[in-house]
Amino acid sequence: MEHSSPLAAMQPPSVMLGHCFRSDAPTSYHGFSPLPGLGPGGFNFKDLSMKRSNGDYFGTKVVRGSSPTASLAADLSQNFHIDQSPQVATPRRSLFSACLLGNGNRRGVDDAMTTPPLPSSSPAPAMDIMDMSPLPHKPPFISTPEIELDSPTLESSPMDTTMMSTDGLVPDSPTVLPKDGKQERRRPTFLRPSLARSKAQSFQVGMTRPAPESQGPPFKFQTNGINKTSSGVAASLEDMFGESPQRERPMMRINSTSGLNSRLRPPLGSGSHVRGNGSPSAASVRKSAHPNMRPRKQCRRSLSMYEHPEDVIADSEVSYTSNAPLQSISDFEETQALQLPHFIPEEQADNLPRIDKATLVDIKEGKYDNMFDNIMIIDCRFEYEYDGGHIVGAVNYNDKENLAAELFADPKPRTAIVFHCEYSVHRAPLMAKYIRHRDRAYNVDHYPQLSYPDMYILEGGYSGFFAEHRSLCYPQNYVEMSAKEHEFACERGLGKVKQRSKLSRAQTFAFGQQSPEMEDSPTGRCRNNPGDRKLLASPFNDSPGSRFPGRRMLSY
C-alpha cells in the first residue's frame, strides 16, 4: 500500500488486475491469493450495515447551516455505533477501500501491487466510489439523459427544502430558476418571522455570505462530453440576482426603531426576512434578545414640560418680569432702623439696643430733637430710690402694667424711650421686653409695624450716670436699693418683681400664678383679660359673646 498512490487506492477492485480477487486465481501469485470469506456469497455489505441503503456522498442530507465543523460532527455521530458497520461512506473512508478487504495478505500486496494505468473514464456505471471522494477528479462516464442540477450553495440544502415544504410556505422571491430547461419557479419563503429569524441566526453564526462578485463559477457537471452550468445559460450577475421587492411601510413614529410589530404576522408576499429570496442582504436579519419577550414600547414618557429641544432655547431667550421677593421678618425689622447711636452686647440674650452715657447727655442737650417729637426716660427703680435721686426729666414706673396702660392708651409716633434702673441689668431689661411684647400684640394686624420702635437701655444705669454727670441729676444724691432704712420696701418691691417675672418654688403653673408676659408668644395675639384690651384701646373690643372666657384654675 505504501508503494501505491492514493489514486491507485481509490480505484475499484475490478479495474485493477482481472485475477486479483478471483476465487480461481493461480496460487503462484501469493500476494493476490483469494481472501477467506470473500466468495460470491461470503461478503454481504447490506447485512453488515443493518440492511440500510448505502448512500453516496452528495446524496447525504446536509445539516442546515453546515460548516466544516458541523460536517465532521455529523459524520462522527452517524458512524460511531456499537456492533454496527459504518452506515454512510465518508470522504476519508473512500480513500482506503482496501481496508474493507481485511489485512490477511498485507505483505504480499505491499510487495506486488503497483499503480495501474488510469483510464479517462470508468465504463462501469455502478462503481461510484470516485464520486464520494472530495478530491478533484473527472466525473464517471454514465449514460443518462441530460440533467441540470442546482448549484450546492449555502442558501439551500435538503434540510431547508424539507422544512420549507412542511411548513406550508408560499412562493415569494422574484428569483428565476430554470426547471427542466423551460419552466420557472419561485423559491418558497417563510410565513412566520420566528422561523426566518431562527434560520438567519443559524446561518450567521460562524460564517458570512460572500459577495456575488467574489463567488467562483457555478458548479459544473459533464454530460456526454458537454459542460453545462447549473443555470443552463451564461447568466450575468444582474440576471442571477434581482432587486428585493419593495413593500409599503406603514407610517411610523419618528423615533421608532422598528417598522414592523414583532407580534403581528407579516403580509403574504413580504419576503424581506427570508434569506432565500435572492437578495444579497437577505441574511442580515436582526434578531431580538428573546423570541418570547414582549416588544419594547416605542413611545417615550417624560415629565418634562418641553416636547422639543427648541422650546427650551426659546424659553431661555424670553425675559420674565417677576415680582420682588418677599422679605423675611428680620428684613422687615431691619428696615425700621434705629436712629440713635447704639450697640448690642454679645453677653446679653435680650438683643435690646444699648446707649452709653454720652448719648444720653446729647439727648438732654437736644441734639436729636429733630428726629423725635418726644423722648421719654423711664426710671424702673423703686419709689424710695427715685426720690433719693434721679436723672432730670426721668419718669418713675416700677410696675409694667401701669406703664403699658399709659403708653398704649394713646400711642404717640416718633417717640424714643430710654429705660434704666440702678445698674440696668435686671429690672430695666424686664420692663423693656414687656413693653415690646405688648407693642407686638397691639400691632398684631399690622406686623411688623411697631408703635415704639426706638427703645433703648442706658448702659451702666443710674449709678454709672450719677458718677460722671452728677449735675444732670436731681437731687444730686444716690440711694442704693439695699439701703438699711428701706429694707422693708425693698423686700416688697422684689416680691412683686419675682412674682411677675418667673415661677417661684411655692407658686407653680398649676395654680396660674405665672407672669402675664409668660403666657403669650411675642408674635401671637395677646390673651390677656378683655378688660385690659379695652383699657389699651386695642382693636379687639369687648363683646357680649367674647371668645376670651375666664381662665380655669387647674390642680393636679
UniProtKB/Swiss-Prot annotation:
GO terms for molecular function: protein tyrosine phosphatase activity. Residues 165-186, 257-297, 505-556 are annotated as: Disordered. It holds the Pfam family Rhodanese. The keyword Aminoacyl-tRNA synthetase does not apply. Its EC number is 3.1.3.48. The active site is at C421. It is an enzyme of class 3 (hydrolase). It catalyses: O-phospho-L-tyrosyl-[protein] + H2O = L-tyrosyl-[protein] + phosphate. Coiled coil: none annotated. GO terms for biological process: cell division; G2/M transition of mitotic cell cycle; positive regulation of G2/M transition of mitotic cell cycle; positive regulation of G2/MI transition of meiotic cell cycle; positive regulation of mitotic nuclear division. Residues 371-474 form the Rhodanese domain. Residues 505-516 have a biased composition (Polar residues). Residues 287-297 have a biased composition (Basic residues). The keyword Cell division applies. Keywords: Cell cycle, Cell division, Hydrolase, Mitosis, Protein phosphatase. InterPro entries: MPI_Phosphatase, Rhodanese-like_dom, Rhodanese-like_dom_sf. Signal peptide: none annotated. One of its GO terms (cellular component) is nucleus. Belongs to the MPI phosphatase family. PANTHER family: M-PHASE INDUCER PHOSPHATASE DUAL SPECIFICITY PHOSPHATASE CDC25, PROTEIN-TYROSINE-PHOSPHATASE. This protein functions as a dosage-dependent inducer in mitotic control. It is a tyrosine protein phosphatase required for progression of the cell cycle. It may directly dephosphorylate p34(cdc2) and activate the p34(cdc2) kinase activity. This is M-phase inducer phosphatase. The gene is nimT.
